[in-house]
Amino acid sequence: MFKKLLGDPNARKLKKFQPWVTDINILEEDIQKLSDEELKAKTGEFRQALEKAKTKDEEKAILEEILPEAFAVVREAGKRVLSMRHFDVQLLGGIILHQGQIAEMKTGEGKTLVATLPAYLNGLTGKGVHVITVNDYLARRDAEWMGQVHRFLGLSVGLIQQGMNPEERKKNYTCDITYATNSEVGFDYLRDNMATNMEEVVQRPFNFCIIDEVDSVLVDEARTPLIISGQVERPSEKYIKAAEIAAALSKEKEHYEVDEKARNVLLSDEGFAEAEQLLAVQDLYNPEDPWAHFVFNALKAKELFIKDVNYIVRDDEVVIVDEFTGRVMPGRRWSDGLHQAIEAKERVDIQPETQTLATITYQNFFLLYPKLSGMTGTAKTEEAEFEKIYNLQVTIIPTNKPTGRKDLSDVVYKTEVGKWKSIAQECAEMHKEGRPVLVGTTSVEKSELLSRLLGEGKIPHQLLNAKPENVERESEIVAQAGRGGAVTIATNMAGRGTDIILGGNAEYMAKLKLREYLMPKVVKPEDDDGLGMVRVSGLKKSHVAKGFDPQQKVKTWKVSPQIFPVKLSQETEGMLKLAVNLAVKEWGERALPELVVEDKVAIAAEKAPTTEPVIEKLREVYNLIRQEYENYIEREHNQVVGCGGLHVIGTERHESRRIDNQLRGRAGRQGDPGSTRFFLSLEDNLLRIFGGDRVAGMMQAFGVEEDMPIESGLLTRSLEGAQKKVETYYYDMRKQVFEYDEVMNNQRRAIYAERRRVLEGRDLKEQVIKYAEQTMDDIVEAYINPELPSEEWELDKLVEKVKQFVYLLADLTPEQLFDLSMEDIRTFMHEQVRNAYDIKEAQVNQIRGGLMRDAERFFILQQIDTLWREHLQQMDALRESVGLRGYGQKDPLIEYKSEGYELFLDMMTDIRRNVVYSLFQFQPQPAVQTTAAETV
């Protein structure tokens, strides 16, 4: 009703930006006439205009002024380099991103291309633009693919990848546009704030950030803090013993209860007594021999962390599975002893526990950017959160072609068994009709269950989950999920970023064929154990093939033959072999690292100009292969469209409607037909945990067979209600994390600013003298009570304390302070400590000029780092303890804020005092003197 009266706010926003789109379209004709050189020269013109800006506001005004022409230039460059022209809706998306908003664009609408517009415009300032993606593969793909446009126009493009060294990182961050993943940029920020000199700092001050899949980063991962940690030795026997205790305690005997909603386990009085008896201790909380932490973690590991759902065991290691993407996350560990508890439960080696050295949540990290924007297919459901926490508006961009997707109503089964049988049946029917099916499952375990059912029915299918053997083929599987009759099972839709094209993706198939022939010939064998590696077995030492070591792992790039639609013609295959031989001749036999070859294949598969003859030859062959595949695929594409397109099956409602919408969004891309349906059961987690007793009552009421679908308005409403409940619950949790971390964030900003000032060596002496004066003030206040007459002041203790800090004031006596007021004593002490510091500086600098400055930097950084680490632990402990104060009618957050502030002030005082003490005690070794003398 209100919408009709006031008009749709989204439509109003789009209407406001429409004149710019019109301007860009008017400019298109003129820009088309420019030669390549003239087009590139536009970058220089824009930069000259921006150089005139003296303030941020002036810069903003100039950017808006040049926006239509800059966007028209990017559109033309896209046509010339990538043969891709930005549609009008993509221009709108680009404008919205430049405004610092979130653009909601449906799957397949070319979000990646949209980002080139604001990235180029803001890259002109020279202050850096970060384009953030969710994994290394996508960052590399976008930097290579879209980076062509920027490089063609004369902007530098950087890429940050896991495993890069600091020099490479620094070089890539100084580029105009840098592609990276959220975790790499976040960890680099934390590492920069642990650097001991400016050479180690890799990032520049932040400017503008575009996040692809913004909902995944700012909502799904918002509760996950980035943590850099150091190892702490804890006895592994305690974890093993606690795992035995957890196994002995039982939920049925009411030793503990599991709160699945809060993901917590609560011990009952009986449970406490039983655990204490089994451990033969008086008190689980005894500070001398604490057990509570170990037992609680062991119970959580037993009840809440399930193998093949939350983690997998690989090579005797517990590896986390990302609950949102279904991908494994090697190298990531749960903190606070939880990972060790799971290792004890699984009886694998227990790795040492870690202590947090630096931490930040994604929420607070991305708020460090002065301008932030993002793109996703699904943001509207979380609009309130984006606005409240990040101050980001969401604008929905219309699709280029009307969508042809049908969302069919949910079917609900009484039991899970009934549900899975029906899903397998539906897959079989679709396969028979020749329609491709994509089934989204929520865990590795469920995907394997369906795979078994389909196997029994002899239905050919592809399985994509976090298991290592499937990860390597992820994009390959997703790219072929649109073939006629293909059945693909994917866990939580890993593989966002690869399009499902009806009939199959000819470009991707051609690239795979190129890799299959090229990689084994030019990639050097690695000794490390990567994924998808196979042991070379059956080789006897006596006749080992040249270049092979029987123990060495050799990677295979062989693709399952059914992936390719047709066999290559002899002529094309012959040309492919010739091109590979040329590559071997130029690059050497098995001489290049894998990533380098991947990059070369990616460039060969694109249209950007290249001067490298091998790449030109590979590109020529790639285009021939693609053409052969395309001719065949076109027929298949038309057949699949005729059958109704891709059918997407959801096997469980996710906790968030947004994730369901993402799965639905895989069907009906760019106007293609398609359909989606969710199969649910009354035993599904969402209904079980959040649907409450009403659903349990319904289960009794429905006296139906397990494989009979139930359709009921009440049930659908119950489901939607449950989802909204969960969303609100998780939003409240994220908001709480944000509010608590906001307290830490203010402290973090203060300490990092102080640290950076010291690192840059600004006014170090003044800083230390200020510390010394404040320390003197603290001593004066401790021993002088202005309320008492001066005869009762403890001047002798005061002087003694000063001498402990500053031994150079050995001549100071209480008598010198007798007739002075408190204020005068303060001033006198300031003078004394300044003089003492000058003497100390002269002594130290005799050994080596400038040594005192180095000492100041070293001691301040050392104290900041050590005490900040301890402070992080204290804040964690405080956060756990304030939770209990809610029972005492106190607001835990207010308590956390005030006590956290007190702890922070104490830490700052300790830093000051320790630095002053350390510097006055600092006695440079005479040995330094002799070496210094020799080198003169």
Swiss-Prot record:
Record CDD domains: DEXDc_SecA, SF2_C_secA
Higher taxonomy: Bacteria, Bacillati, Cyanobacteriota, Cyanophyceae, Oscillatoriophycideae
Alphabetical list of InterPro entries matching this protein: Helicase_ATP-bd, P-loop_NTPase, SecA, SecA_CS, SecA_DEAD, SecA_motor_DEAD, SecA_preprotein_X-link_dom, SecA_SF2_C
Catalytic activity: ATP + H2O + cellular proteinSide 1 = ADP + phosphate + cellular proteinSide 2
Coiled coil segments of this chain: none
UniProt keyword annotation of Iron present: no
Residues annotated for ATP binding in this entry: 90, 108-112, 499
Pfam families attached to this UniProt entry: P-loop_SecA, SecA_DEAD, SecA_PP_bind, SecA_SW
HAMAP family in UniProt: SecA
Record note on quaternary structure: Monomer and homodimer. Part of the essential Sec protein translocation apparatus which comprises SecA, SecYEG and auxiliary proteins SecDF. Other proteins may also be involved.
Keyword flag Acyltransferase: no
Job of this protein: Part of the Sec protein translocase complex. Interacts with the SecYEG preprotein conducting channel. Has a central role in coupling the hydrolysis of ATP to the transfer of proteins into and across the cell membrane, serving as an ATP-driven molecular motor driving the stepwise translocation of polypeptide chains across the membrane.
Name of the protein this chain belongs to: Protein translocase subunit SecA
Family as reported in the entry's similarity comment: Belongs to the SecA family.
GO molecular function: ATP binding; protein-exporting ATPase activity
Principal subcellular localisation of the protein: membrane
Top enzyme class: translocase
Organism the protein comes from: Trichodesmium erythraeum (strain IMS101)
Domain of life: Bacteria
Enzyme Commission number, as recorded: 7.4.2.8
Gene Ontology annotations for the cellular component aspect, listed alphabetically: cell envelope Sec protein transport complex; cytosol; plasma membrane-derived thylakoid membrane
Key words of the record: ATP-binding, Cell inner membrane, Cell membrane, Cytoplasm, Membrane, Nucleotide-binding, Protein transport, Thylakoid, Translocase, Translocation, Transport
Topology of the protein relative to the lipid bilayer: Peripheral membrane protein
